[in-house]
Amino acid sequence: MKNNRKLLFFDIDGTLLTAYPWSIPESTRKALEAARKNGHLLFVNSGRIYAMISPMVKELGFDGYVCGCGSQIYMNNELLFSSSNPNPLCREVIETLRQCRISAFFERPDKILYDGSSKTLPKAIQNLKTEVSVEDLSLYEEETWNTFTFDKFLAFPDKDSDTETFRRFVDEHFSCFIHDDAAWEITQKNYSKATGIQFLADRLGASPEDTFAFGDSTNDLPMLEYAGISIAMGQSDPMILPHCTYQTTSIDEDGIANAMKHFHLI
């Protein structure tokens, strides 16, 4: 690891991208470019699968990506690590969701799956069809049903759902983050945004003290707790603040640039 080189990890939504309609502030673009010129390595660290990362983010020229909450790791356009839930567990998830009357969609590195037999499909599925390949797993023939996998999934309980039974099942097998819009982000228990940082730091010969994490929500907590320096955006969920080194201004108020200047990264 070169002297003074740091590894910088950025969440996407609310950190790099503003709220809808998504955009990247010009101050963020310039700060990332300046940090790269100073020799630092820049990584996206997101709950999104790689296929769902916006082209406007990819155009920023990151050195790598931690995707799917640590289930896929890329560097220099090479896939270094990938982990999916085993097929028997994936089938059990589908069956449990059906029993508990909960709609969901399921994320793979290359596509999104959904259960067309669900009475209430997530509205997000219609939007996703314009962004990424989408597939109805209820149409699978036996061979595909017995081999398909996914990395993580989003569940959308409503007032008619048996959330108590489903939560017991989730807690036994997965990690779960409940978002402000009531979506449950459900990820593999052994992998997180933190394990993604650890993997890349080990590969690059960096210590945790050489890592910076930038985030704004509870699913960023693992990486914020692991990184040597953790930075909360100005509009962050208050729950993450006790776990952060520093709170910068909001994304719309040059938050990324201000944090980088504060820590002399640029």
Where are the predicted features?
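Asp-based, Mg2+/Mn2+-dependent phosphohydrolase catalytic module
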Residues: 226, 231-266
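Conserved acidic, metal-coordinating active-site core of Asp-based
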Residues: 96, 100-103, 107-214, 218-226, ...
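Active-site phosphate-binding/coordination module
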Residues: 27-123
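Residue-level signal for inorganic ion chemistry
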Residues: 35, 46, 153, 224, ...
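Short, structured coil segments at secondary-structure junctions
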Residues: 60-61, 69, 169-173, 226-227, ...
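Asp-based phosphoryl-transfer active-site loop
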Residues: 4-21
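Short, acidic loop-to-helix structural element flanking the phosphoryl-transfer center
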Residues: 21-40, 83-91, 137-140, 191-202, ...
